[in-house]
Amino acid sequence: MAALLRRLLQRERPSAASGRPVGRREANLGTDAGVAVRVRFAPSPTGFLHLGGLRTALYNYIFAKKYQGSFILRLEDTDQTRVVPGAAENIEDMLEWAGIPPDESPRRGGPAGPYQQSQRLELYAQATEALLKTGAAYPCFCSPQRLELLKKEALRNHQTPRYDNRCRNMSQEQVAQKLAKDPKPAIRFRLEQVVPAFQDLVYGWNRHEVASVEGDPVIMKSDGFPTYHLACVVDDHHMGISHVLRGSEWLVSTAKHLLLYQALGWQPPHFAHLPLLLNRDGSKLSKRQGDVFLEHFAADGFLPDSLLDIITNCGSGFAENQMGRTLPELITQFNLTQVTCHSALLDLEKLPEFNRLHLQRLVSNESQRRQLVGKLQVLVEEAFGCQLQNRDVLNPVYVERILLLRQGHICRLQDLVSPVYSYLWTRPAVGRAQLDAISEKVDVIAKRVLGLLERSSMSLTQDMLNGELKKLSEGLEGTKYSNVMKLLRMALSGQQQGPPVAEMMLALGPKEVRERIQKVVSS
């Protein structure tokens, strides 16, 4: 870079940047036939993937798939001091877990790689050289100390800090003298006063006069790493990105990016800036909130589809809000023109209900139910382990029966290994005294239930059991039907509340019900 700067000193610098001007575009999605739709999700690996990032990735994914396009993961890791170990792997892992894997990525590779900015430095250097040659960029020799003083002075005067463009109009002699002392200066981009208007697919026509509110930005740091503004423009161009769907916080920077496209003579992509995802109270969804990271939700048993559902249901882009949408339905129903400018308010208290709906859908599907059976077996082993008196509870037939009976009643698979459902896997410690406190007719009730099981153990249904249990309580003077149910619930589960007794009996099966009742009565 220093050698290039010296060569440029031998030539006359043009007074204005060259490049093809960016014209006004028609207000359409740019998805006409023959257009190769390519979008990118470009997070910085400065932290693990959280809900805000997932939403941006999802909108890119469903837009790409709706138009038979490609979804690219690019890691913007040029600020090496802030890179968090394991974050890059976590981001791609969580995208795959969520069911929205990239078509091209650091892990998967692809024709436009590498997909980490730290491995694309030569491209940024080439773009910087091109900008220096046309005079659209210039070296800056200002020290960090001077820049800090500028910032403090502006704040002291209640002004917005900005660079004063001190190095913008240095003479060739001045540049040569500075290069002799500092051969690796930062490179700044010369902001133009005339900024092209652009049609944002969400916010409409925009124009931000950046030169009037900020100084010329650094595009290449002295360490040879680019800043975000240059890197994203260079990468989007070389990767053939057709549409940039990103957070609305980048809307004001788009004019700067368009000036870079113009100076480099490149055609810019279509831009769509997505409104922010906020907490229900309107506060910012912060990475500092540990429970917004995807790995937290995965560990807690929330399904990917429920997260995709809730983060789209709270925002816009669809004709109506609707709980329970699957990923294929999201792709089919998504309409970028229906994304509004209003922030999306996320109410995570509703997530269990979203998860309940999606879990119920999985249970009702035979092949997916088999996968849930395997996962629940693992959960039971982990939760109870050596406490299992009877390992028959791990039998797939038994586990599947539990899932079918409790579908629609549980929000997470983990709920089935909570203390409330421990009776399904281990026998409760219930003494005779606990039953006597409920009714004096313990032996009579037990005898009738055992007789019922003997007569009809092969044809038990919940409706039949409900009817038989009501008949069973008839003729028991001083004992109400409700007390009979309390007694049986206590004998079977050791709990005073829970699912209907008839369902408990169906879940446990005639053999286990018989053994539990006999054990308690004889204790």
UniProtKB/Swiss-Prot annotation:
Modification type N6-succinyllysine: residues: 256
Name assigned to this protein: Nondiscriminating glutamyl-tRNA synthetase EARS2, mitochondrial
Binding residue positions for L-glutamate: 40-42, 76, 228-232, 246
Family per similarity comment: Belongs to the class-I aminoacyl-tRNA synthetase family. Glutamate--tRNA ligase type 1 subfamily.
Annotated function: Non-discriminating glutamyl-tRNA synthetase that catalyzes aminoacylation of both mitochondrial tRNA(Glu) and tRNA(Gln) and participates in RNA aminoacylation for mitochondrial protein translation. Attachs glutamate to tRNA(Glu) or tRNA(Gln) in a two-step reaction: glutamate is first activated by ATP to form Glu-AMP and then transferred to the acceptor end of tRNA(Glu) or tRNA(Gln). In vitro, cytoplasmic tRNA(Gln) is slightly glutamylated, but with low activity.
PROSITE patterns on file: AA_TRNA_LIGASE_I
Entry's EC annotation: 6.1.1.24, 6.1.1.17
UniProt motif ('KMSKS' region) ranges: 284-288
InterPro entries per the UniProt record, alphabetical: aa-tRNA-synth_I_cd-bd, aa-tRNA-synth_I_codon-bd_sub2, aa-tRNA-synth_I_CS, aa_tRNA-synth_I_cd-bd_sf, Glu-tRNA-ligase_bac/mito, Glu/Gln-tRNA-synth, Glu/Gln-tRNA-synth_Ib_cat-dom, GluQ/Sye
GO molecular function: ATP binding; glutamate-tRNA ligase activity; glutamate-tRNA(Gln) ligase activity; tRNA binding; zinc ion binding
Catalytic activity field: tRNA(Glx) + L-glutamate + ATP = L-glutamyl-tRNA(Glx) + AMP + diphosphate; tRNA(Glu) + L-glutamate + ATP = L-glutamyl-tRNA(Glu) + AMP + diphosphate; tRNA(Gln) + L-glutamate + ATP = L-glutamyl-tRNA(Gln) + AMP + diphosphate
Entry keyword set: Acetylation, Aminoacyl-tRNA synthetase, ATP-binding, Disease variant, Ligase, Mitochondrion, Nucleotide-binding, Primary mitochondrial disease, Protein biosynthesis, RNA-binding, Transit peptide
Short sequence motif named 'HIGH' region, residue ranges: 45-53
Residues carrying N6-acetyllysine: 486
Transit peptide, residues from-to: 1-41
Keyword Mitochondrion assigned: yes
One BP annotation, GO: glutamyl-tRNA aminoacylation
GO cellular component: mitochondrial matrix; mitochondrion
Protein source organism: Homo sapiens (Human)
Gene3D superfamilies, sorted: 1.10.10.350, HUPs
Record's subcellular location: Mitochondrion matrix
Disease field: Combined oxidative phosphorylation deficiency 12: An autosomal recessive, mitochondrial, neurologic disorder characterized by onset in infancy of hypotonia and delayed psychomotor development, or early developmental regression, associated with T2-weighted hyperintensities in the deep cerebral white matter, brainstem, and cerebellar white matter. Serum lactate is increased due to a defect in mitochondrial respiration.
Binding site residues for ATP: 50, 249, 284-288
